[in-house]
Structure formats: structure tokens, C-alpha cells
Amino acid sequence: MTCTPRIRFSFVAAAAVALAFLHPTTVVAQDASRTYTLAEVETKPSLASMASFQRLVADGYPEDLKRRRMGGIAEVAFVVDASGKVEPGSVEVVHATQPAFGEAAKKALLMAGFNPGKVSGAAVRTKVSLPIVYKAQ
């Protein structure tokens, strides 16, 4: 006795395949030198590991400010490249409640890993702005 597999025809699946041939997906080549804004990307850059980034921020907390139990914020703008790395020359402190928080934020970002932004499924360079909050413990 042989067993033959049953194949069920699905009209919905057949229609989807037919539509794929009628309207093929177009993948647009991205300009590798272009920097996209968050509004232009379909997938926004994200931290590869929030826990790792939090450790980087905590480990880089300026000692003098930690001793004085001072908290604050550093808002930084930077470019995440297509491989998920922060471009070193792109990091700028937009605002910091203490200059030391701005410097610490820059150092943490340069060691952090990101999932890059994407356009049409392709990883692209993306400009990001991020507030980093330092809380005194």
C-alpha cells in the first residue's frame, strides 16, 4: 500500500502568485553615500542590545557628577551607517545639562551597536537624534 500525499489547491494562494507576476516587487538600489532621515526610512535604526547600551552609559557616568549625585541629560545626533556602526565624525552633542554628560554620551555611542535603518529592505545610513538620561543613584 502506497501513500500519496494530498495536495490542496488554494484559490487565494494561486491569486497571490498570479498578482506577484503581474506586479513584481521593485527593489531600488540605494545611494551608499546618502544619509536618510528617520522620516525617510521604512525601518528605523534601533539599538542592537538595550542592556549593553545601558551598561555602557552606566560605566561611563562621569565620576565627579556621580560623586555629587548629579543627574542630567545629553541629547546627541549621529549617523548610523549601513553596517549598524555609529560614524565617529558624525556624533554631535545637541544639548547637555553638563558638558561631561555630552562627552560620556559620545563615548558610549561610539561603542554601541545598532540595527541599521532600512529602505526597500536595504540597510542605509540614517541620521538619528537620541536623548540619554543620566540618573543619580
Question: Language-model segments: which ranges?
Answer:
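Charge-biased low-complexity segments
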Residues: 2-10, 23-137
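Bacterial N-terminal signal peptides
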Residues: 12-22
